């Protein structure tokens, strides 16, 4: 637990100004670590600050769950590396030790031994022999030894997992034509095959159930004595030590809830954690989505299913936040017009919602990031994921503006626009409008995109299987892109200029066709759902608009550029693709989804890829970014009563992770 301070000058300090704030913290491998401001935290009431503090503590307790979900050996490897880093007494200035430090930093970034985005395993730049020497130099009491395990046995166990490229090569495998369960290194399944998993959950599903639970969401599926068994994540079940600690902090947080509705949200989450009952999870989700009046809000639990190649099992995550009241006026305009957007979308009428319910949207300030939202974090969230809850109770959509601020501020003057944009026209638009249009596209994506459309009766929400995440992200992106160019945007005052949307169109197409390739390793295909979606959209509209030269890929001075000649026709193409992708989603057309994703979203243009990597390298830009959290401390007065919560922005990347491993490491090494 973070320490206590006696009341003094640290309390109620104003948020540092943008121009005085140091956003960049660390840089290693392909990663830059940033910090983010928490504007207006000082304006919250004491009760709200206390609520944030205790929800933050609950968030930090779940860190080890996500490590273990990503691979069963992650905790063992991380704890071994941390023991070496903290206790090695030899030469700490050698290149080998530098490489080990970088590897440990990458493990923290990926919440395990795989890259958070590409899903590929990190291969250390130091030798197995060097690693063995270091581990053997550490006192056995400092190492994560299992009962009866020697140091040599530990080394023998984890060396191939770390160093052999053929062992656990991919965290979540999405490749066509293989068993996705057996070829994925994650820890959601053990000893089972993809057909067994599909049959196991297929039997549970009732096509006539209009309010199904999210089968398999909070469990690990294993085979024991020939039988398939779910090990449930709950108090008394799998991950009980961490979940019990989360519950303990949630019980403290309840006392500071802003209102009875929020109290009900927190207590229903506690009930779910205690029982593991997915009906209680639905109850929590409904209460959460219907709490619109609380300024402080949070997500805590098994939420997103991107890490499961079959899209059923959820990773643990948490974000604690509070509403940015001024910026939320933008999203409230969007929410208020949700029915208009649904009615005027270019999709077939049978796939539209007749009545759009409960689309609530807000702009938030993140106070803490945890689990699958840390160190890498989303810039927008739309929950819950349950289709029937969204249909009957609505969804809650957020744009995380202090995170986008950190990205934007850290990117100023980095040379990217000069290197990759076609002309001063595109650069000028980006300078004037990109920050606004990027946030607006996120608003539209989260608030309207994910909330739009409907499944036809009897369609299985998991019908698209491994392609479901990509199709869903493409659907939401296209909805946002289509409406970015609608005159309604300026009519509603969401954009200040009728050409402002072109900044987002250019940025999106350039990224999808070209610049996002910096995130792909040489000779690899695209695996991550959001990247597949962006390339799918960009290449589809490029191909379909080729006759009219809507988009051109041109060479100048031996460099490749994207040129958009007709923004209005591009918008029409976005609408055509949106209609097709909504049809695929609504009807559960697996083959249609597979064809789109495999034909447009997966394969990489290799010569262009090599060029993009070289151009990025010259700019010294990190293609990925992660974050460190602020540190919150309870301030007590002379009567030992909490008088404030202070916030500090000085903790470094290494110090933060070592502290988290010391203070929030509840799980055993082997779970």
Predicted regions and their residues:
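Long, well-structured alpha-helical subdomains associated
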Residues: 481-584
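Catalytic Zn2+-binding segment of zinc metalloproteases
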Residues: 447-459, 483, 487
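N-terminal-proximal low-complexity accessory segments that begin disordered
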Residues: 16-80
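Extended, compositionally biased alpha-helical segments that mediate assembly or anchoring
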Residues: 566-671
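An active-site-proximal "capping" alpha-helix that borders the catalytic cofactor pocket
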Residues: 45, 259, 469-486
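Short alpha-helix carrying the canonical HExxH Zn2+-binding catalytic motif
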Residues: 435-448
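Contiguous, non-catalytic segments that form substrate-binding/exosite surfaces or channel walls
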Residues: 105, 109-223, 228-427, 434
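Post-HEXXH active-site segment of zinc metalloproteases
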Residues: 453-474
